[in-house]
C-alpha cells in the first residue's frame, strides 16, 4: 500500500510540474507524435525511471529520501526531453 502511495505522489508531482511548466498548445500541434512514437517514448521513460527498484527500508520512506529520488527522476526526464 505504501508503494502505491509513493507512486501516486510521484505521478501527482509530475503532473503538477508539467502543468506549471507546460508549453502552449499551438507549439505542440506542429510536433504531434504518432501513437506508436508516444508509446515508445513512455516505455523508454519508464525504463529510465526504474520505479520498481525503490528501496523499502526506513530511509526510503522518509520524505527527504523521496524528495531526493523525485529530483533524480526529474533530472532524468529533463535530460530525456531536451
UniProtKB/Swiss-Prot annotation:
Q: What UniProt keywords apply to this chain's record, in alphabetical order?
A: Amidation, Antibiotic, Antimicrobial, Fungicide, Membrane, Secreted, Signal, Target cell membrane, Target membrane, Toxin
Q: Which domain of life is it from?
A: Eukaryota
Signal sequence bounds: 1-22
Q: What's said on domains?
A: The mature peptide (62-81) probably forms alpha-helices which disrupt target cell membranes.
GO MF: toxin activity
Q: Which residues carry this modification: Alanine amide?
A: 81
GO biological process terms, alphabetically, are: defense response to bacterium; defense response to fungus; killing of cells of another organism
Motif Processing quadruplet motif: residue span?
58-61
Q: What other remark does the UniProt record contain for this protein? A: Negative results: does not have hemolytic activity against rabbit and human erythrocytes.
Task: Identify the taxonomic lineage of the organism of origin.
Answer: Eukaryota, Metazoa, Ecdysozoa, Arthropoda, Chelicerata
Q: In which tissues is it expressed?
A: Expressed by the venom gland.
* PTM annotation, UniProt: Cleavage of the propeptide depends on the processing quadruplet motif (XXXR, with at least one of X being E).
Q: Where in the cell is it found?
A: Secreted; Target cell membrane
A Pfam family this protein belongs to?
Answer: Latarcin
What Gene Ontology cellular component terms go with this record? Answer: extracellular region; membrane; other organism cell membrane
Chain's role: It has antimicrobial activity against Gram-positive bacteria (A.globiformis VKM Ac-1112 (MIC=0.3 uM), and B.subtilis VKM B-501 (MIC=1.2 uM)), Gram-negative bacteria (E.coli DH5-alpha (MIC=2.5 uM), E.coli MH1 (MIC=6.0 uM), and P.aeruginosa PAO1 (MIC>40 uM)), and yeasts (P.pastoris GS115 (MIC=20 uM), and S.cerevisiae Y190 (MIC=20 uM)). Causes paralysis, but is not lethal when injected into insect (M.domestica) larvae. A second study reports antibacterial activity against E.coli (MIC=100 uM) and S.aureus (MIC=84 uM).
Protein name according to UniProt = M-zodatoxin-Lt3a
Residue numbers covered by the propeptide annotation in the UniProt entry: 23-61
UniProt record similarity statement: Belongs to the cationic peptide 03 (latarcin) family. 03 subfamily.
Mostly located where?
secreted
Amino acid at each position: 500500500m505504501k508503494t502505491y502511495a509513493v507512486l501516486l505522489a510521484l505521478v501527482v508531482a509530475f503532473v503538477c510540474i508539467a502543468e506549471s511548466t507546460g508549453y502552449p498548445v499551438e507549439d505542440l500541434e506542429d510536433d504531434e507524435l504518432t501513437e506508436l512514437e508516444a508509446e515508445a517514448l513512455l516505455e523508454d521513460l519508464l525504463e529510465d525511471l526504474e520505479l520498481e527498484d525503490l528501496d523499502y527500508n526506513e530511509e526510503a520512506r522518509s520524505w527527504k529520501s523521496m524528495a531526493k529520488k523525485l529530483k533524480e527522476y526529474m533530472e532524468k526526464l529533463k535530460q530525456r526531453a531536451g
